[in-house]
Amino acid sequence: MQKEVLNVETPEGLRIIERIPVTAGSVILIGFMLRVWAGLHTVIVNPDGALYIQQAMAIHDKNWISLKTCALTFISAYPFLIAVGYRLVHDWMLSARMISLICGTAMLIPLYLIVKEWVRKDNAILTILVFAVTPVLVSNSVEVIRDPIGWFFLSAGIWAVIHRNTPCRHGFLLAASLCFLAAAWARIESILFMAITLAYLLYDRKNTKTMDILFFLSPLLVIFFFSLAGMMFSGLTLGDLHRGKEIAGKFIEPIRQYRLMADSLKTLVWSSPNPFVEFFLPEVRNHIWLIAMGTVLNRFLEAFFYPFVVFYFLGLSGIRKYRSDTRLLYLTALTLSGLSMLYVHTLQTWMLYYRFFGIVMIPAVVCCAFGMEKLRDIISRKWSSEPVIVFWVLFIVIIGISLPKNLKSGDTDKSVFIQIADTISRHAPDAAAIKTATSRHTQIWISFYANLHRAGTPPCPLDEANCWEFYPDDPALFRNRLRQNGLQFVLWEEKHWLFHNFSLSDLMGSADYRELGRWHHRDTGQMILFAVNGPNN
């Protein structure tokens, strides 16, 4: 008897995998290997990362009180993921870097699926190669920061929105909403994508039904109830989780800071001994907005990587060609709103890191794809080259021009701070948490690494009570402050030691201190570690 052949539909998840050809998978593997290399050659944790790991330790120990007592006023998704990863690998640093690595690499998959909606597979492959090797994305995909988590969920959310015109439209919109909320939990700025997407759905009424909008908004209610449950079990407030006050402050604070900056510059005009400053500062005061714009432009070019910027600019014409496609209008709105937000952020804080431009790069991926397509057409026509030859030439060039920057090892000299922390840990009692008096410049690294492998939630690695800048300039009073705060060690730093009545000779000549070792770093000068002698230490 002939067997009946069943026509089983391939699940959507498997269809997504089938859409990724071998070459695209190889590009993702290249991106992964570059990130692994960067991770293996990243010597020391970034300062923010120490605070996230400290929060993760508190979560692991169910020490909810310590979650917001150490510099950070919010609780993002990252510490929870680190705590989960620690249960698998039993190493805090490995867990934190592993999460960034996975998310920073996985974002390439939805980006490929996005650009494949408009360009051929070969051009889509070259586009994600650009994202796989962009130095800012590579280096920050192994740092202990929240951005890679946000990048992945933003990419996945955008893909779900532009792919919503399928029989599973409600499922895609629900997934998009969850992705944007997850991204916002990692980086609060990502809530902008939620707002722009809602505006887009309301605008594109031709392809959007009322139920679509309801499905998109439904996770907000679920998140609200989960937040209430979290409050009941952990004692946290709703504001600890959604950071609503910070979102509202983004609209008001830049205006206030702009006025404060203008007033400060006005005061400086008469306080400088240089007569030319009297004419220079009023010009600066009147053009603060222009300086902020120049700052954003500079960081934009650096973050996107100068050689790769040409792809994005060439792709602008491609957007005009498909202007009837409302999905491109959506991506353009995301890109421009991201740039606008970074400009406002600059006016507010004047701190603009390269990694912040991830929220601009992601929606601009289609612009890069159009630019890649146009560049290949130009090269093929001008030199009458075969498309496959142009493909592999560009493939090699893209990797080649980015490789020197991606293989460069940074901050290797900072391993000296880990050596100091290891020395402290060896000379401290096994059961006790370690507290060391240092300058504010080194406190977070020394405290973090000295307590990293000790049981329980460690002390805050950014506690001003352990920074000797706030101590009295008197040997006896200094020693009393150490005893009051329970500090077991003192790190003298040549360039940061501010005391006049309390010098290195007082430390070395006192029976209260015992020298343990000497080190040197260009930022601190010579460093000498002392153990604090006494009945309480």
Each model region followed by its residue ranges:
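Signature aromatic-anchored transmembrane alpha helix within multi-pass, membrane-resident enzymes
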Residues: 25-28, 178, 195-198, 217-224, ...
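Short helix- or helix-capping micro-motifs
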Residues: 28-34, 127-135, 139, 159, ...
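Membrane-embedded, lumen/periplasm-facing catalytic core of multi-pass transferases
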Residues: 395-449, 453-462, 475, 528, ...
